[in-house]
Amino acid sequence: MTKDYQDFQHLDNENDHHQLQRGPPPAPRLLQRLCSGFRLFLLSLGLSILLLVVVCVITSQNSQLREDLRVLRQNFSNFTVSTEDQVKALTTQGERVGRKMKLVESQLEKHQEDLREDHSRLLLHVKQLVSDVRSLSCQMAALRGNGSERICCPINWVEYEGSCYWFSSSVKPWTEADKYCQLENAHLVVVTSWEEQRFVQQHMGPLNTWIGLTDQNGPWKWVDGTDYETGFKNWRPGQPDDWYGHGLGGGEDCAHFTTDGHWNDDVCRRPYRWVCETELGKAN
């Protein structure tokens, strides 16, 4: 029995020895695994929280940037509209100023033109007055000379180079103007030189004025018989053209001074001013 007890005890000792060899290691491995998984979870959670914070910050900044951009766009739009309004206002104001300046310039030019015309008329009146005074002086001298011959131009006529000239202030057709001169024992002016043309222009001014030149009966002729072909001429370029497109019937058979002094052929029925001419001492 003692042997059996010893064997049993020996068996228990062996079992204890084997148990000590296998030991309790499985428990720490499980705990280590659990700890490793928890660390990964914490790390993942931390990274997730960090990522969430970053996303929130970026989202917040993006929203702020969008708001700032919207405000900038609105401010730029307002500035653009305001600038356009100011530009339009300045443009409108500039146009008004430009129109006023043009109006003032136009009025000034008109006043200057009126002054020039008044000055020209005044000079003509002065010249006519001087001519009348000379004519009166001439006639008075003739009377004082007990009828001795002294040749003078009539009052209201102007003497130039041995001829007397009368300048109209009204208008007539060419034929009526020629008849008027004939009643004064004169004829429509016959221009034979540049000097005579300048003299007539100085007294008439820039006006359409009949002269004693016509081709109603064929070729161009001066009313006093002065030779046309070899004499002085001052036609406007392209004239005479005997134009029929004026709608008044017939051609253009009578000559006149234009406003620039050149000659032009025109319809004889047009009403223009005229100049009568006669030799000194022949006028009525």
UniProtKB/Swiss-Prot annotation:
Q: Where is this motif: Endocytosis signal?
A: 5-8
> What post-translational modification does the entry describe?
Phosphorylated on a cytoplasmic Ser residue.
Q: Which GO terms describe its molecular function?
A: asialoglycoprotein receptor activity; D-mannose binding; fucose binding; identical protein binding; metal ion binding; pattern recognition receptor activity
Q: Which residues bind Ca(2+) 3?
A: Q239, D241, E252, N264, D265
Covalent lipid adducts (S-palmitoyl cysteine), residues = C35
A Pfam family found in this protein is Lectin_C
Record has Transport as a keyword: no
Q: Which InterPro entries match?
A: C-type_lectin-like, C-type_lectin-like/link_sf, C-type_lectin/snaclec_domain, C-type_lectin_CS, CD209-like_CTLD, CTDL_fold
PROSITE patterns from the UniProt entry = C_TYPE_LECTIN_1, C_TYPE_LECTIN_2
Task: Name the positions where Ca(2+) 2 binds.
Answer: D215, D242, E252, D253
Q: Which residues face the membrane's Extracellular side? A: 61-284
Subcellular localization, per the record?
Answer: Membrane
Tell me what else is known.
Calcium is required for ligand binding.
Q: What is this protein called?
A: Asialoglycoprotein receptor 1
